[in-house]
């Protein structure tokens, strides 16, 4: 049986949606987030929770959780459309911006968590150095760990600057957006 043009189009869209869902794992996001991102993206206009629930087969409660996760990651937003009473959700149509949003959201969390851990460990180890009766071996190990923590902090500072490099879009001065795919031909 010969496929209709509509069948081929729907098949291609489904492949793209599935690939977007798979790619979300790279960013530490669940595939359900990627699936919803792909569905809204392919729809090319904002969608309601009911529409998304129907398109994914998920409950409205689960869909609400997924959309909230997407909003937290800055890859979706609630939008207003005159005459529509239900909440509408839309996604960034620019793949580059979606990448930057996901990259920044995930790495900002990592940086924040590790800076908190740095402060805690640095305080504990510095307090330990002030104690009497610390063996020379223990003191040496504490100093090694404190030096390691400084290197760690430098790394997370660099990572913070890298995030800013992407968020400011300065990255495009060095790695421009392309109009033609040179590497996929």
From Swiss-Prot:
One of its GO terms (molecular function) is DNA-binding transcription factor activity. Keywords: DNA-binding, Repressor, Transcription, Transcription regulation. The keyword Transcription applies. SUPFAM superfamilies: Winged helix' DNA-binding domain. Is not choline-responsive. Residues 49-73 bind DNA. It holds the Pfam family MarR_2. Negatively regulates the transcription of the opuC operon. In the absence of GbsR, is also a negative regulator of the opuB operon. Binds to an inverted repeat in the promoter region of the operons. Belongs to the GbsR family. This is HTH-type transcriptional repressor OpcR. It comes from Bacillus subtilis (strain 168). The lineage of its organism: Bacteria, Bacillati, Bacillota, Bacilli, Bacillales.
């Amino acid at each position: 049986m010969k496929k209709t043009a509509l069948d081929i189009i729907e098949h291609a869209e489904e492949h793209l949606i599935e690939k977007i869902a798979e790619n979300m794992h790279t960013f530490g996001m669940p595939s359900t987030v990627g699936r919803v991102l792909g569905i809204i993206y392919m729809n090319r206009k904002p969608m309601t929770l009911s529409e998304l629930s129907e398109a994914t087969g998920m409950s409205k409660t689960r869909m609400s959780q997924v959309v909230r996760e997407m909003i937290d990651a800055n890859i979706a937003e609630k939008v207003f459309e005159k005459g529509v009473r239900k909440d509408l959700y839309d996604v960034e149509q620019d793949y580059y911006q979606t990448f930057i949003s996901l990259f920044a959201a995930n790495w900002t969390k990592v940086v924040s968590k590790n800076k908190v851990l740095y402060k805690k460990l640095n305080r504990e180890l510095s307090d330990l150095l002030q104690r009497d009766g610390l063996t020379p071996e223990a003191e040496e190990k504490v100093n090694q760990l404190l030096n390691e923590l400084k290197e760690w902090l430098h790394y997370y500072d660099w990572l913070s600057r890298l995030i800013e490099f992407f968020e400011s879009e300065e990255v495009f001065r060095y790695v421009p957006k392309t109009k033609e795919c040179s590497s996929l031909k």
